[in-house]
Amino acid sequence: MERRPFGPVPREVPVIGQGTWYIDDAHRPTAVAALRRGLDLGMTHIDTAEMYGDAEIVVGEAIAGRRDEVFLVSKVLPTNASRAGTVAACERSLARLRTDRLDCYLLHWPGSHPLEETFAGFERLREQGKILSWGLSNFDVPDLDAAWKAGGEGRIACNQVLYHLGERAIEHAVLPWCEEHGVAVVAYSPFGHGDFPGPRTPGGRVLEEIAARHGATARQVVLRFLVRRPSLLAIPKASSAEHAADNAAAGALRLTDAELARIDAAFPLAPRPRRLPML
């Protein structure tokens, strides 16, 4: 599995990781098996959040006995992101995950608490060894500028954002900003939200043709397209061990410049929206 830098963090992570949104305790055995299969195949970057319900508990079971292999990320809700609230939320997440540390802790989206307070909480956790690094999620350029000035300069590890073929808004300004400032960009929901292009659509046919040329699947082609720039990482969710294996295979896929151009033309970048989209 190809590995890339994670902002200023002194550790590289796999280009394809594992997301856990909508994983719940009702499907625990299947979810645990999928996550463990992903680990076996090198997808050691696992992303979760306190907002995801039982996901942290499921992740804790999946990584039991393998914690040192994992680059573990969770997120604090903006409503909890005061200085003391950030520390308390992290400690609750650590308990659910059954670990003593996170590799990165994110503010889930901009909220009402001053960023200086949240970042002070992050730094307190880092000093205590409970987190290695910290970052952001769903931050547009004005929010990123504010975060940089509020104490984030040289410290923001990543910005996790919505990014898929039908939603390429980050390419207008967010992605260039992050690249200029040395911040990793992590794509969540890389297959969209129930709107993955079907094989009979014009764009879907392009994906299928390219996939056939490589002995791959359309989803693997999409993942590879989304991480075509060195600053990009992706965290698809897998519903089964087989699905995890399919996602992992995208890490070894290589697309030609001509193929990347075909995909780019089939799913063109839309005009810049007023706000950065998020789920």
Tell where the protein language model's regions lie, with residue ranges.
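A short, structured active-site edge motif that brings together acidic residues
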Residues: 69-81, 104-108, 138, 161-163
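Short, acidic/polar
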Residues: 26-38, 82-97, 142-145, 170
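Beta/alpha (TIM)-barrel catalytic core signal, keyed to glycine-rich beta->alpha loops juxtaposed to Asp/Glu
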Residues: 3, 110-279
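Acidic (Asp/Glu)-rich catalytic clusters
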Residues: 7-10, 60-68, 91-100, 124-126, ...
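N-terminal binding-site loop/beta-alpha segment at the start of enzyme catalytic domains
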Residues: 1-70, 190, 277-279
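Active-site mouth loops of central-metabolism enzymes
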Residues: 19-29, 74-84, 108, 113
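Active-site groove signature of glycoside hydrolases
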Residues: 97-113
